[in-house]
Swiss-Prot record:
GO annotation terms (biological process): folic acid biosynthetic process; tetrahydrofolate biosynthetic process
Organism: Staphylococcus aureus
SMART domains: FolB
Underlying gene: folB
Catalytic activity from the UniProt record: 7,8-dihydroneopterin = 6-hydroxymethyl-7,8-dihydropterin + glycolaldehyde; 7,8-dihydroneopterin = 7,8-dihydromonapterin
pH dependence comment: Optimum pH is 9.5.
Protein name: Dihydroneopterin aldolase
This enzyme's EC code(s): 4.1.2.25, 5.1.99.8
Active site location: K100
Gene3D superfamilies membership: 3.30.1130.10
InterPro entries per record: Dihydroneopterin_aldolase, FolB_dom, GTP-CH-I_C/QueF
Amino acid sequence: MQDTIFLKGMRFYGYHGALSAENEIGQIFKVDVTLKVDLSEAGRTDNVIDTVHYGEVFEEVKSIMEGKAVNLLEHLAERIANRINSQYNRVMETKVRITKENPPIPGHYDGVGIEIVRENK
């Protein structure tokens, strides 16, 4: 099954990071979420109850990203995937990618970050 729902390029300001500068100044985090979901029923019925409401998913991600500061992106991504998988039975798999576009480390790059994939069991 190849059906997906995606939320791409969500941006949130937060104070996450292992470096003290990140905790003091904060930064913008870019989050992409991809959900593996069977969309065939929603395609037939044209009813939002037969799919996953991405507005609700956005609010779940926002509450975590703009919530209590943590050290690791890995921890944020795990919390997001767990929240989505526990709230939405239709989701078979959740992929979360979090990017720091301007972390306080030397170098030239478009961003640094992590990506995880978690099956909904």
